[in-house]
């Protein structure tokens, strides 16, 4: 009933409002077009067009069919290529989770453009998670690949890892903060007087990692790195920032870096993917990272020197 030729004919008549104009568009005779529409109406059991001597217009049923017909025709026309892609080992859907520390909208867009050009029938889903929330997505939510899991060892032997680099940290505050010019190292008693600005771990199943905060110290939780940086600049509170993200603000004296009793060690991050069952799209993403291709360079800017 709804074969490609019938759908093309119906859409052409609906869009031109004329059997003769539809015939011209499809290089068919008017009689052929009229017969196909008549047969379609007989098979569906409803009138799809109001006919006058000058034009044809859609009935309510015809309007409904037109909304569906375009999608059906597009699906039918793309199906051979989709089936070939599946036969070639290409995934129907790839879910990618990215660590908040590495998340870069321009880098994400560049990667998606590269992938979409090569795998036009694959659905890509991007998620942004924090700390152990990245591993959580891989282990419990069916994600295919993670850009920036914490550590250099897999939490399960079903995953492969490629170390990307280590994030270096600086303890910062606004340049006009009361502690900005106090003798170093700052004491816990001095630090405890001011709020710690943190981003909460997004893990749902795994144990959340606790960010820097002293016992009894007020904590302000913000949703992302952009807000955390803005809060430090506004003098709202104190805390650690990745060196590469705050260096320009340290250089122009918007922020100052101070030494505290317990400095945060570097945080190693890795690419992680499933050892078994990965398709060609995931394999290509892994290759981009292991070969440090330009297409993924935006994700590695935070490290300064990748693999460090």
UniProtKB/Swiss-Prot annotation:
Transmembrane segments: none annotated. GO terms for molecular function: DNA binding; DNA-binding transcription factor activity. Pfam families: HTH_1 (PF00126), LysR_substrate (PF03466). Residues 19-38 bind DNA. Keywords: Activator, DNA-binding, Transcription, Transcription regulation. The keyword Cytoplasm does not apply. It comes from the Bacteria. Residues 2-59 form the HTH lysR-type domain. NCBIfam families: PRK10094.1. Belongs to the LysR transcriptional regulatory family. Positive regulator essential for the expression of allD operon. Binds to the allD promoter. This is HTH-type transcriptional activator AllS.
């Amino acid at each position: 009933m709804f074969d490609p030729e019938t759908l093309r004919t119906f859409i052409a008549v609906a869009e031109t409002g004329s059997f003769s104009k539809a015939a011209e568009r499809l290089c068919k005779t008017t009689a052929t077009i009229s017969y196909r529409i008549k047969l379609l109406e007989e098979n569906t059991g409803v009138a799809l067009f109001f006919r006058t001597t000058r034009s044809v217009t859609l009935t309510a049923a015809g309007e409904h069919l037109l909304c569906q017909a375009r999608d059906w025709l597009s699906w039918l026309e793309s199906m051979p290529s989709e089936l070939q892609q599946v036969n070639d080992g290409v995934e129907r859907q790839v879910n990618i989770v990215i660590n908040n520390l590495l998340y870069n909208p321009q880098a994400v867009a560049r990667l998606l453009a590269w992938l979409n050009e090569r795998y036009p029938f694959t659905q890509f889903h991007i998620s942004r998670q924090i700390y152990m929330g990245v591993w959580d997505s891989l282990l419990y939510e069916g994600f295919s690949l993670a850009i920036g899991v914490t550590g250099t060892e897999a939490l399960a032997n079903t995953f492969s890892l490629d170390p990307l680099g280590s994030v270096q940290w600086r303890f910062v505050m606004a340049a006009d903060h009361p502690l900005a010019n106090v003798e170093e190292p700052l004491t816990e008693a001095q630090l405890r007087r001011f709020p710690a600005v943190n981003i909460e771990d997004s893990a749902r199943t795994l144990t959340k990692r606790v960010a820097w905060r002293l016992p009894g110290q007020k904590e302000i939780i913000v949703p992302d790195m952009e807000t955390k940086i803005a809060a430090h600049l506004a003098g709202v509170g104190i805390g650690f920032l990745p060196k590469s993200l705050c260096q320009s603000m340290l250089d122009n004296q918007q922020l100052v870096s101070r030494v505290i009793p317990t400095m945060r060690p570097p945080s190693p991050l890795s690419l992680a993917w499933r050892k078994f069952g990965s398709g060609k799209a995931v394999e290509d993403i892994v290759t981009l990272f292991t070969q440090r291709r330009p297409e993924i360079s935006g994700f590695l800017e935070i490290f300064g020197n990748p693999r460090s």
